[in-house]
Design a protein with these regions (language model features):
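A helix-coil-helix interface module used to build multimeric assemblies
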Residues: 1-187, 192-197, 206, 259-262, ...
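Short beta-alpha connecting loops at secondary-structure transitions
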Residues: 11-15, 58-60, 259-279, 301-315, ...
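Amphipathic alpha-helices that form helix-helix packing interfaces
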Residues: 30-33, 113, 117-120, 124-127, ...
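Alpha-helical support elements that line or immediately flank enzyme active sites
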Residues: 32, 105-117, 226-235, 240, ...
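Glycine-rich cofactor-pocket loops
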Residues: 129-151, 250-261, 267-268, 299-308, ...
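Glycine-rich anion/phosphate-binding loop at the beta-strand->alpha-helix junction
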Residues: 164, 212-305
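Active-site-adjacent "gating/activation" loops or surface patches in catalytic cores
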Residues: 195-212, 216
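Long, amphipathic alpha-helical stalk/connector segments used for oligomerization, subunit docking
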Residues: 283-366, 374
Length: 440
């Protein structure tokens, strides 16, 4: 975890102090459960729950000998107690405490992620509504296609982010489970009721069955969902970067007073935040392979997953949280240039209307093949003109002029019918209906 890419609230969940505090919370829940089952006296339960304490230096010192951080933890806590310490960590195994504590930490962390996703969705929605009718050129393969609106671009992003909210709700169900089932998961030394009570105290569900650990397909699902979320965020960031290129310049990240873009070139205004998000997404996705490989543990459990999770889980949550907040800020403060969008539309010389013309000709009795041939032939002529450099008059509709002078077209379409094909409103007539689908 790098301080540079961490928000305080999420970072506070992933440190040694919080980890052991959560261990203690789990151990106290187990003590309370034993007490409710009549196996620990009220006085011992009260002493443990009120007096049990630890300090990190003590744990570190003990771990030098034990080479086992959970045993170092329980030993340290026992030193803060009296005879009642015999009931601390009673009847359970290390993974019962560690995995159940991890469930608590992941649940809290995922709630922060869900909050970040909701914020991003709302920001995308608001900006989409703001630019619902803002005309721009749609691009496929990076090449001009047909007129669309910037609002549609943002609405598409919003709808994708909304799908992640649904996926994360399901993932929350998978990860918010505890396990107090003993060394082999067969409840040999503690009844099922102990697990049920302890998890109830902690606000967790119980798994139907465990071995020594909570099964790692649950963790892998989380990692994959965060990787998918990152890919969607990268998709948004990459498109912003493309639209901010100098020759496009339809949107721009906010550039603050005093900000610098280059140590060598004073004129530079770069999409550095979107570039940063792109890089963070690569980091997030990089954890999916080791987390998937953690699923296949030996028999009832081995330790190969532990080192992976010590890296992966904190970094997955902290980086995802930061990525979401940064992207939300980029979208919220994004500067949009509608005039440049219209200018770029005009740069096609009218070619963006080719399909509209193509679809009118078959209505007049011409075959699709003949229609396509005529329209494409005229379009290719315009490409040749555009290849020679920018035309003198940006408002000049080269494609329209070519069509109006084509004798073959005149047999099927009048001048007014041809001109009617060059109408931007034709391409925006369904925007309202699309928005209704997305946002209502």
């Amino acid at each position: 975890m790098l301080e540079r890419y961490a928000n305080e609230e999420m970072k506070a969940l992933w440190n040694e102090q919080t980890k052991f505090e959560t261990y203690l919370e789990v151990e106290k829940a187990v003590v309370r459960a034993w007490n409710k089952l009549g196996q620990i006296q009220d006085s011992d339960c009260e002493k443990i729950c009120s007096k049990a304490a630890f300090n990190l230096e003590c744990i570190k010192e003990i771990e030098k000998t034990t080479k086992h951080d959970l045993i170092a933890f329980t030993t340290c806590v026992a030193e803060s107690l009296g005879e009642e310490s015999r009931f601390f960590h009673y009847g359970i195994t290390s993974s019962d405490c560690i995995d159940t504590a991890m469930a608590l930490l992941m649940t809290k962390s995922l709630k922060l992620i869900q909050k970040g996703v909701k914020n991003l969705y709302e920001t995308l929605k608001n900006r989409a509504l703001e630019h619902k009718e803002t005309l721009m050129v749609g691009r496929s393969h990076g090449v001009f296609g047909e007129p669309i609106t910037f609002g549609l671009v943002l609405a598409l992003f919003a709808d994708e982010i909304k799908r992640h909210l649904k996926a994360l709700d399901l993932t929350m169900e998978f990860i918010s489970v505890g396990a107090i089932s003993g060394a082999m998961g067969n409840f040999a030394h503690a009844p099922l009721e102990l697990e049920e009570l302890a998890c109830e105290f902690l606000g967790l569900k119980t798994a139907n069955i465990n071995n020594q650990v909570i099964q790692r397909d649950r963790y892998a699902r989380l990692a994959c969902d965060l990787a998918l979320l990152a890919s969607s965020c990268e998709k948004i960031a990459v498109n912003i970067r493309h639209l901010q290129r100098s020759e496009v310049y339809e949107v721009e990240e906010a550039f603050s007073t005093g900000q610098k873009g280059s140590s060598a070139m004073p004129h530079k205004r770069n999409p550095i935040l979107s570039e940063n998000i792109t890089g963070l997404c690569r980091v997030i996705r990089s954890f999916t392979t080791p987390m998937l490989e953690n699923v296949a543990l030996w028999h009832e459990r081995d330790m190969s997953h532990s080192s992976v999770e010590r890296f992966a889980l904190p970094d997955l949550f902290i980086t995802s949280d930061f990525m979401l907040s940064r992207l939300n800020s980029v979208i919220e403060n994004l500067v949009v240039y509608p005039k440049n969008m219209l200018k770029n539309l005009a740069l096609s010389g009218g070619l963006v209307f080719s399909q509209r013309v193509l679809l009118e000709l078959p209505k007049k009795g011409l075959s699709r093949e003949e229609s396509y041939s005529i329209v494409q032939e005229n379009a290719m002529k315009i490409w040749e003109v555009l290849q020679q450099g920018a035309f003198k008059n940006a408002d000049e509709n080269l494609f329209l002029n070519a069509l109006l002078n084509d004798e073959r077209l005149k047999k099927y379409l009048s001048e007014d019918e041809i001109k009617a094909c060059f109408d931007y409103s034709y391409y925006t007539k369904n925007v309202g209906a699309i928005f209704k689908r997305v946002f209502e």
